[in-house]
Amino acid sequence: MSSKLVLVLNCGSSSLKFAIIDAANGEEHISGLAECFNLPEARIKWKMDGAKQEAALGAGSAHSEALHFIVNTILAQKPELSAQLTAIGHRIVHGGERFIQSAIIDDDVVKGIENSIPFAPLHNPAHLIGIREALKEFPQLTQKNVAVFDTAFHQTMPEESYLYALPYSLYQDHAIRRYGAHGTSHYYVSREAAKLLDKPVDQLNVITCHLGNGGSVSAIRNGQCVDTSMGLTPLEGLVMGTRSGDIDPAIVFHLHDALGMSVAQINTLLTKESGLLGLTGVTSDCRYVEDNYREKADSRRAMDVYCHRLAKYIGSYSALMEGRLDAVIFTGGIGENAAMVRELSLKKLALLGFEVDHERNLAARFGHGGVITTDTSRPAIVIPTNEELVIAQDAARLTA
């Protein structure tokens, strides 16, 4: 069988996640993370053949040095993998309205990613660096780089979901609307849910909850996204690790006018100092909140606000299911591991027919998925996400 090996790159502002995946069978040959870019402690960790390795990249290193290390040090240990690479898949956070599906990267696609920088100012510039460096390091794959957009899956939303009640000219002239994020994850777990529920995708009605340091909920009706909680940017919606999610917009004016905060300070407050971090005053880590829920007021406060918001979104999205909700899906680092978040949130949704099975819920953690509700309940299911596999499969499909 011909090789379907794909290098998957996910470039953040200060990190680079990478993997080599066989798109045909999902086997992961190498996976790793380069982090702490532009700092003295810049380093890279990777796993190959079951063995974990780590190395310093050198003070001030960033994407360029990391990719150079991947090619000339890591892949040099297994030259046959390099030789079998058929494509490179790039995760792109924001594709604006233009990209409704993955695309082979050319000058026009690069321009489209550049045009979406205002909506993802930290992520899209990093993705462009990753694309440029990949083209440099893998000249033989120049026509085989594929962009996979987090926003693409949400482009099926109807106008009533994506428009804000602002002057319509802001949408017409400046593309200000809801875009959503985590689309690749919502797509993957909804397709896995269809298999588990033995339903055709185009007849599947589910609400998917991707809960990690960032979090979003999507309403998926007949296999297509009809609403999602993140908005123009990934700040809207759920309580997150350091992001506020939904607030009264007038709080921004109050912080500026009454408290004398600058726009930059307010931006930092809402994106980096709020969420679980803001509510606990200690940490953005959900594990701390879960572990200390019964003993510490800060943890109880944070957990209760988090689950209240999540349950509200699930409840409101059930109204979009046209009378039939097949299941609620949990995924992402918190969704897959925080049994307490799932139990407390679903407890608020008894009206929708959810009843958690305590033992099943505890069992569905640390890489184990499955149904977490009782046999008579409407199903809630934990499905570990695999965005890298979707990126690899899209890259292989488009470059075949």
From Swiss-Prot:
CDD domains: ASKHA_NBD_AcK_PK. InterPro entries: Ac/propionate_kinase (IPR004372), Aliphatic_acid_kin_short-chain (IPR000890), Aliphatic_acid_kinase_CS (IPR023865), ATPase_NBD (IPR043129). It is an enzyme of class 2 (transferase). The keyword Nucleotide-binding applies. Pathway: Metabolic intermediate biosynthesis; acetyl-CoA biosynthesis; acetyl-CoA from acetate: step 1/2. GO terms for molecular function: acetate kinase activity; ATP binding; magnesium ion binding. It catalyses: acetate + ATP = acetyl phosphate + ADP. Mg(2+). Can also accept Mn(2+). Its cofactor is Mg(2+); Mn(2+). GO terms for cellular component: cytosol. It holds the Pfam family Acetate_kinase. PROSITE patterns: ACETATE_KINASE_1, ACETATE_KINASE_2. Coiled coil: none annotated. Its main location: cytoplasm. Substrate binds at R91. It is found in: Cytoplasm. ATP binds at K17, H210, L211, G212, N213, G214, D285, C286, R287, G333, I334, G335, E336, N337. Mg(2+) binds at N10, E387. Keywords: ATP-binding, Cytoplasm, Kinase, Magnesium, Metal-binding, Nucleotide-binding, Transferase. The keyword Cytoplasm applies. Its EC number is 2.7.2.1. Homodimer. Catalyzes the formation of acetyl phosphate from acetate and ATP. Can also catalyze the reverse reaction. This is Acetate kinase.
